[in-house]
């Protein structure tokens, strides 16, 4: 299984915005629009070999003491339950950890997304007991 994260450009834009997930995640088109407005956001396509299977976006959040945030993770509904999301998250977490000036990564998820919350806990994230808007705030400290 060759999971890689790739830049989104004119060559793969259409295939990335065509990826779908049933619930709990903004569309990839909306996320790409956010990345255009919030230029600190880094959107990436998730590929298994040469097949686009998902989308991930992270950033250093200037409105939150320059903390790292993983803003989005989605795996297309046809490609779920194959370990792609876990590998993509591990790649991003390892990349963020290379920045020795930080020691935590934040994300938030829908409180009803019990599968997602368990997924993030299995990666080492802990629920803080706080809400980020209407979502559960989770933090990975390292």
Residue map of PLM features:
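Conserved GNAT acetyl-CoA-binding A-motif
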Residues: 96-108
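Acetyl-CoA-dependent GNAT
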Residues: 2-71, 76-78, 95, 99, ...
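Conserved beta-strand-loop-alpha-helix junction that forms the acyl-donor binding cleft
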Residues: 106-117, 133-135
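Terminal substrate-recognition subdomain of acyl/acetyltransferases
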Residues: 136-142
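Conserved active-site alpha-helix within GNAT-family acetyltransferase domains
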Residues: 86, 111-128
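Active-site acidic-Proline motif in GNAT/NAT acetyltransferases
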Residues: 76-78, 82, 111-112
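Conserved acetyl-CoA pyrophosphate-binding loop and the N-cap/start of the following alpha-helix
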Residues: 79, 83-91
